[in-house]
A protein has these predicted regions:
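Transmembrane alpha-helices
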Residues: 1-12, 101-133
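Generic alpha-helical transmembrane segments of integral inner-membrane proteins
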Residues: 3, 7-15, 19, 67, ...
Length: 194
């Protein structure tokens, strides 16, 4: 679930960043305004609202998480696209009349690879945390096996009052290790890039 959400987040963020960074002007201002508005809305309540509105299922959960998580990727990639568009060879290609999609695919996207992989690793960890939280609250995919669902069922079977801590430890440890692993991969990619 986290990987599919990260792929969708990267797709949305990259598309909007390419449009805003390459074309600039009104498109850039509009997309930046949408990003600012989307970042101002708290993501967890919005995700909960989207899940309540959409049909229950794995695709709905992936879509709801992706709709609320693309803003950071779009903002970072937009800045990098604007920097790349100022390079001399991009200006020469524009002056020669090369079409925008060709320039984007041939020259800009390969230069975004490192940032995109780093953001994907961080997006996976964020999606895993969000899914676990939503499943714990009972808004995840019912019947699917997830660490959040294990926590949900343990909590609603009064495991705390019965002092059955072993119901909580395995999913908490697994969530922590998985999220920490993806975060470290993301931070390693960022350190390597700098």
């Amino acid at each position: 679930l986290g990987v599919f959400s990260a792929l969708l987040v990267s797709l949305i963020g990259t598309a909007l960043a390419l449009i805003a960074g390459y074309f600039g002007g009104t498109a850039d201002k509009t997309i930046c305004a949408v990003i600012d508005i989307a970042m101002a809305v708290p993501s967890l309540p919005l995700t909960m609202l989207l899940i309540a509105y959409l049909k229950s299922g794995m695709f709905s959960l992936i879509l709801a998480i992706s709709i609320t998580a693309w803003t950071g990727t779009a903002r970072i990639l937009r800045t990098r696209v604007k920097q790349i568009c100022e390079l001399p060879y991009i200006k020469i290609e524009k002056a020669m009349g090369v079409s925008a999609p060709v320039i984007m695919v041939r020259h800009i996207l390969p230069n975004l690879k490192d940032i995109l992989l780093t953001r994907m690793a961080l997006s996976v960890s964020g999606a895993m945390t969000t899914e676990s939280g939503l499943s714990f609250l009972g808004l995840g995919t019912y019947g699917q096996k997830s660490w959040g669902n294990i926590l949900h069922f343990a909590f609603f079977r009064n495991s705390i009052l019965r002092k059955q801590i072993w119901w909580y430890l395995p999913p908490i440890i697994c969530i922590s290790v998985a999220v920490m692993g993806f975060m470290l991969v993301g931070y390693y990619g960022r350190q390597r890039r700098e």
